[in-house]
């Protein structure tokens, strides 16, 4: 890992306003508890088999294909609730394109993880809330397996923030010297357009085994 300044961890209340926030459009529901109309598969018009709606939540058990939003987003404020099973591993991608075989080759990822038992818990670079393999998240804000956690991703231009349960975990600047060095030191160095799209799809990772649920997925375009 590059010896660079760690991402800033700030314990901030949920009501705090992200840097540079301005009046914006109303939130749009990407999942309303009853329909997958806002979603499809990666490079596919239909949602992958294995995702289902149960009790107002979007769920899966076992390894399935990734979901991507039908719409693309540039500057946005995304909020969702997630619940993961024991040893579970997943993620939320943002500004993803479909130029590569997999969305994670182009899109930054907000990591979703069981930090206690998942194999990826060996480093904070891959624990819950991290910008996967690029910026670490601080410990202490994740609710246990079986409980709902609340994730928030705020992206305005190159500035990105990751929030968990009302606490800002990290922030970074795409294209900065620090970001560039970290990406170069990661597995994403093989993909020259990783993280560089100004707008793209939201993605929900399904290709790891185990149970996973989402609910109350809402996004607001920032102006």
Where are these regions (language model features)?
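Bacterial N-terminal signal peptides
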Residues: 1-9
């Amino acid at each position: 890992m590059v010896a660079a300044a760690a991402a800033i961890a700030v314990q901030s209340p949920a009501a705090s306003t992200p840097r540079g926030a301005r009046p914006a459009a109303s939130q749009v529901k990407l999942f309303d508890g009853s329909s997958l109309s806002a979603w499809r598969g990666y490079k596919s018009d239909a949602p992958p088999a294995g995702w289902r709606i149960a009790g107002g939540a979007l769920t899966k058990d076992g390894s399935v294909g990734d979901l991507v939003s039908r719409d693309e987003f540039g500057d946005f404020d995304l909020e969702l609730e997630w619940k993961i099973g024991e040893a579970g591993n997943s993620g939320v991608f943002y500004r993803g394109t479909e130029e590569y075989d997999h969305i994670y080759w182009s899109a930054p990822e907000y990591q979703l993880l069981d930090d206690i038992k998942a194999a990826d818990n060996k480093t904070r670079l891959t624990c819950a809330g991290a910008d996967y393999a690029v910026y670490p998240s601080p410990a202490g804000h994740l609710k246990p397996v079986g409980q709902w956690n609340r994730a928030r991703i705020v992206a305005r231009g190159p500035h990105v923030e990751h929030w968990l349960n009302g606490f800002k975990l990290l922030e970074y600047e795409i294209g900065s010297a620090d970001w560039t060095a970290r990406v170069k030191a990661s597995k994403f160095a093989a993909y020259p357009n990783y993280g560089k799209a100004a707008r793209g799809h939201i993605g929900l990772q399904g290709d790891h085994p185990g149970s996973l649920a989402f609910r109350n997925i809402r996004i607001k375009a920032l102006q």
